Amino acid sequence: MQSFGRRSFLAGAAALGLARSARAASSMGTARGPVQASWPSLVDNYRYPDWFRDAKLGLWSHWGPQSVPQQGDWYGRFMYMQGHPMYEHHLKTYGHPSVAGMKDIQHLWTADKWDPDALIARYQKAGAKYFMALACHHDNLDCYDSRYHAWNSLRVGPKKDVVGIWEKAARKAGLKFGVSNHAAHAWHWYQPAYGYDPTGPKKGERYDAFRLRKADGVGQWWEGLDPQELYTGGHAVLPDGIDSIEAMNQWHDANNGQWIETGPKEDPAYVTRWLLRQTDLVEKYRPDLVYMDDHELPFGPVGLEAAADYYNRSIQWHGKIDVVLTGKQLKPYARFGMVQDVERGFTDHLWDEPWQTDTCIGDWFYNVARLNDKSYKSAEEVIQRLADVVSKNGNLLLSIPQPGDGSIDSEEEKILDGMTGWMAHGGEAIFGSRPWRIYGEGPTELIAGMQNEEKAKPFTAQDIRFTTNKGALYALFLGRPAGSTTIRSLARGRIEGQISQVTLLGGGPLAFRQDGAGLHVDMPRNNSFVPAIRIDGRGLV
């Protein structure tokens, strides 16, 4: 099915003349090679790397200056929106955003308890086969030695090449290394920083992004840096005269709160700088995986330039395209030219092509409330998710949030320990595996799509997922069965082949019988979470 889809798209593209618009290299100095900046060329040249299909689990350090306040996601936007809890926290903790802005939060990012080697070792024990570092989020600070963006982590905050240090630690441990780029959205995401309080004693007083220019930094910690480069310029600025929080929120939602993939019309240089920053990132750190926080690719043809550059560089590095580029909400044809990522979501069917879901045990950026109220995903929930995703031909990219100092908290350590314990016996059903004929069975229905985790119902002992590995069939129980358990998909007459042995991973052989109703297995009581069995026999796989 995959080959047919690829051929069909390429034939249609040729008929429409789409391929002829491609260029071998751009005027931006992107890498030359066979891959051109067009969808037909991406599709024609791309093949999913075996290492990615084998890896199954990646760990992600979604870590940057927005972790400093320990309030969760999108602090750099919501701190500028009066009435939001993050605005109130900022006002009490750091001061009014007309004086203390996001640039000052970035200055407070210390990373003084960050031990990358120890964290990588812990993540690897928990099953990670690849590791991803956040390179730049919507707050527009490059967390690496950026050639084209002065607001970077060597000049601001920890004064370290965060991505470079992560990269060395990951590769030393033998992990594949990835980076995530979220910067394409900074130009509209940051616009509340140009606003003001619509009510209260500071009513109408513009925030720091509106007021400050490079010359204002003389004698300040940010001397020599231009705040407009960080805050991206006023592209959708709150107009004067709004006098209620409700009206302010409505204006922001309508004018700069949309998730769009175009650049600012009046500032094409912003898009040019984005491409320079992206190609610089890829050239410096040679990532095995690049995560784009975008629907397909950002900025239309410029995103295609970035993709072609990355693939051509991979050919220079490896002699072939041996890297992964992910995007979201891909059209069917695009899934043959890059890898689909489903953020905080599920799929309800077995995919023909590899894909990835990314999620976090808590908020993307560290939120201390998750520690205090113990609301992280448990190790059991993580492994349930992993089994479901892998059975459907996917990978799981899991974020373990860190506070600004770079540590992880005690509850996160427990979750990683739980994952480590499960991997010791269950890993053979996951790593290097491939899907079976069907992904599984059970009563729990999952709603497909991104950003829908909260709609998911708890799994039961009847929810079972299948994988295959080295000629064996595996069944993973998402709940905790006890006593005689029936796998209906393995009923005599429904499958060909003969079952000779059933073994509990981490245990021993189990009694079983097979009839027209299913495979009946005597499971021990007091199982650990997500017990997995290996099913051996002839003609099963």
Placement of each model-derived feature along the sequence:
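N-terminal secretory signal peptides and thylakoid transit peptides that target proteins
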Residues: 1-16
